[in-house]
Design a protein with these regions (language model features):
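Short basic helix-loop element that most often maps to the first helix and adjoining turn
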Residues: 3-16
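Conserved hydrophobic/aromatic packing and binding residues within compact polymer-binding modules
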Residues: 17-18, 28-31
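Long, hydrophobic/aromatic-enriched structural stretches that serve as scaffold segments
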Residues: 20-23
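Short, Lys/Arg-rich amphipathic alpha-helical interaction segments
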Residues: 30-61
Length: 61
């Protein structure tokens, strides 16, 4: 569960993470439970958050 690993490493709750990356809490839950997988821009954003979290979070401010 890549999204969960990224979120936990950043220290965010599901709700905080959803707000930061501008997706619904339900979407975060679905990703983390394996019901859905991030695609497109969301998948790319998760990869950037994994590799360069400070840069990505600053850009999301």
């Amino acid at each position: 569960k890549f999204a969960r690993r990224v979120r936990r490493r950043l220290g965010f709750s599901q709700a905080e993470f959803a707000m930061r990356i501008d997706v619904s809490l339900e979407t975060i839950r679905n990703w983390e439970q394996g019901k859905r997988s991030p695609t497109g821009a969301a998948k790319a954003l998760l990869k950037v958050l994994d590799k360069a979290p400070e840069v990505a979070l600053a850009a999301l401010q």
